[in-house]
Amino acid sequence: MTDRQTDTAPSPSYHLLPGRRRTVDAAASRGQGPEPAPGGGVEGVGARGVALKLFVQLLGCSRFGGAVVRAGEAEPSGAARSASSGREEPQPEEGEEEEEKEEERGPQWRLGARKPGSWTGEAAVCADSAPAARAPQALARASGRGGRVARRGAEESGPPHSPSRRGSASRAGPGRASETMNFLLSWVHWSLALLLYLHHAKWSQAAPMAEGGGQNHHEVVKFMDVYQRSYCHPIETLVDIFQEYPDEIEYIFKPSCVPLMRCGGCCNDEGLECVPTEESNITMQIMRIKPHQGQHIGEMSFLQHNKCECRPKKDRARQEKKSVRGKGKGQKRKRKKSRYKSWSVPCGPCSERRKHLFVQDPQTCKCSCKNTDSRCKARQLELNERTCRCDKPRR
């Protein structure tokens, strides 16, 4: 009697451990329920070892939301789960049909689940996360209530399912998972290869550009480019504002020069000069500063050259004579007056290029600068008395 009780003693995980299920089924076929082990429930060294082994299996599959079942065995039915948890739940016939359909489909493996042949030596079949979450609770309840509840659950569970389908399904699960992992690894491999190819192509295109940039320092400009750039055409030139407005010497302009399009370049002939053929005015905002009084921004108009041509040079001396000479009595009177003026004022010009910077006394023929030393110092410059310009201070 003691040996039979020991062999048929139910445990809360009898549906998870091979060898225990056969004893329970044999007792059910004889019409006898398995008697509880001495001490009631899962107690003793053997039951603790079974519980520890079950906990290790559940811990291995808990990450993936499923329970652990031995390879070749069927998943526990609803009645067996109710027996392990200490609750009686009716299982309709429709539930059995659904279980058979699930067996035909095979177990659903999650990526990263343990495969057969792992360190536990068992096949992990990850099912729904709800049974796996209830497994530790069922173990505790079954250990507390004893073998009577387990016997009742064994009688209601009925004959076990055929292990052939479950075994084949458990073998099919790892194959699908391995195919999925192989596909993902191959996809990652080809993606990395494509990135390396594109990176290499990018650097190969950048290398010739870098080499070409190094050759630009020693590049020889062609003749046609030199000729077109140097020929007579409008070019942007920085023009001093005082040169355009010589009478407004009481102001300090900011900026002191403006960019204007002016004719410039070569005509390739000494008898020709680059002159504008079309002109226009442009208005700019310039800041006018009056020392010790204030400043304001005003609009000033400047002359720009739109078109330029190379034309014969004109003799300025002859042009002046032609303008002086004329026909009629009026012109003769003007010539006489100019002669008298030249006799009465024999003073020469202070400067031929910078006449607007000097002031000449007609009686003494003394030249003085329009700019003053204080005005130049206000601009942090020094007055050059020879040129009457504000130059940078010498160091």
UniProtKB/Swiss-Prot annotation:
Residues 73-85, 123-143, 165-175 have a biased composition (Low complexity). One of its GO terms (cellular component) is extracellular space. InterPro entries: Cystine-knot_cytokine (IPR029034), PD_growth_factor_CS (IPR023581), PDGF/VEGF_dom (IPR000072), PDGF/VEGF_growth_factor (IPR050507), VEGF_C (IPR027928), VEGF_C_sf (IPR036841). It comes from the Eukaryota. Disulfide bonds join 232-274, 263-308, 267-310. Residues 91-102 have a biased composition (Acidic residues). Residues 324-340 have a biased composition (Basic residues). Higher expression in pituitary tumors than the pituitary gland. It is linked to Microvascular complications of diabetes 1: Pathological conditions that develop in numerous tissues and organs as a consequence of diabetes mellitus. They include diabetic retinopathy, diabetic nephropathy leading to end-stage renal disease, and diabetic neuropathy. Diabetic retinopathy remains the major cause of new-onset blindness among diabetic adults. It is characterized by vascular permeability and increased tissue ischemia and angiogenesis. Belongs to the PDGF/VEGF growth factor family. This is Vascular endothelial growth factor A, long form. It comes from Homo sapiens (Human).
